Amino acid sequence: MDGVTVIDHPLVQHKLTIMRRKETSTGSFRRLLREISTLLCYEVTRDLELTMETIETPLQTMESPILEGKKLVFASILRAGNGLLEGMLDLVPSARVSHIGVYRDHETLQPVEYYFKAPEDVAERLIIVVDPMLATGNSSIAAIDKLKERGAHNIRFLCLLAAPEGIQNFRAAHPDVPVFTASIDSHLNEKGYIVPGLGDAGDRMYGTK
């Protein structure tokens, strides 16, 4: 699918299967989400540009690669997106963090915005927007709309699961934003949940209903 990368690493798929099980506990779900987010982050950042820097090792001077220019912003779509942040920040602790408050109205399935906080220089950084689920796509579309209003243009979207309907809507709204996901599931049900899915990621992560 154009503009969509499915990260099918065996460890990603193994951990995702355990997360899907309905009997997986809240604590295990949260731990697995942190672990899998590190693996996903590795893939979504694999083409970052490097520059050479002269350094001193204990033995000699050498030229060694280092990330070039201003670095990353991880933009979490609240609240479930926060479950992906910890593992990603373990990998890139210098990344800035943005929080975007968007929730889905369960009656209309439309996004409701309530919070936005991002670094002032988002136009100069690579923004990786994270949310475990790309269902209808409405929340992620709204979040990226807000980032673009602030000048962001180098954006990627990372999720755990995606529905074909959500991908179609997302790509129509933001064809310039590549999508990275661990799985493209079958479809959305009448309530807008991804099927077979794993349920509500936020509820399973925080033990709420």
Curated annotation (Swiss-Prot):
CDD domains: PRTases_typeI. 5-phospho-alpha-D-ribose 1-diphosphate binds at R79, R104, D131, P132, M133, L134, A135, T136, G137, N138, S139, D200. One of its GO terms (molecular function) is GTP binding. Its cofactor is Mg(2+). Uracil binds at I194, G199, D200, A201. It comes from the Bacteria. SUPFAM superfamilies: PRTase-like. Keywords: Allosteric enzyme, Glycosyltransferase, GTP-binding, Magnesium, Nucleotide-binding, Transferase. It catalyses: UMP + diphosphate = 5-phospho-alpha-D-ribose 1-diphosphate + uracil. Binds 1 Mg(2+) ion per subunit. The magnesium is bound as Mg-PRPP. Pathway: Pyrimidine metabolism; UMP biosynthesis via salvage pathway; UMP from uracil: step 1/1. It is an enzyme of class 2 (transferase). Its EC number is 2.4.2.9. Pfam families: UPRTase. Belongs to the UPRTase family. Catalyzes the conversion of uracil and 5-phospho-alpha-D-ribose 1-diphosphate (PRPP) to UMP and diphosphate. This is Uracil phosphoribosyltransferase. The gene is upp.
